[in-house]
């Protein structure tokens, strides 16, 4: 059967999916603003078309251990992406967003630490690029 839960729900103990069970997290669109502050309390996966110079700010409502993906589509070849200091990449090298028209990049992340107001302090991230 189907179990539907709405509202804030907490599960304690171990959750195990068996047999042919699958889990999926809803993808949320990001509005085309200059400084993008993702609300990790409403989604784990996000999508946006990058149309101008954007900065990925410190996410709000983050939880330690939270993981997800941010799908980034290059709108016209001129969009750029900068990052708040909480975003940390392998070797300290900030990736450059793809510039080809309609290029799709994916930024995968895990929240390592948060501040007392639940904004992210340290996010480890890796970008894979140029999906077709």
Label for each model-derived stretch:
Residues 12-88, 102-105, 112-132:
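Exposed extracellular interaction/assembly regions and N-terminal maturation sites
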Residues 88-94:
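Extracellular beta-sheet repeat scaffolds used for adhesion and glycan interaction
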Residues 57-58, 94-98:
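Beta-strand-rich interaction surfaces with strong enrichment in secreted/lumenal proteins
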Residues 1-13:
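Parallel beta-helix/beta-solenoid repeats that form elongated, surface-exposed shafts/blades used
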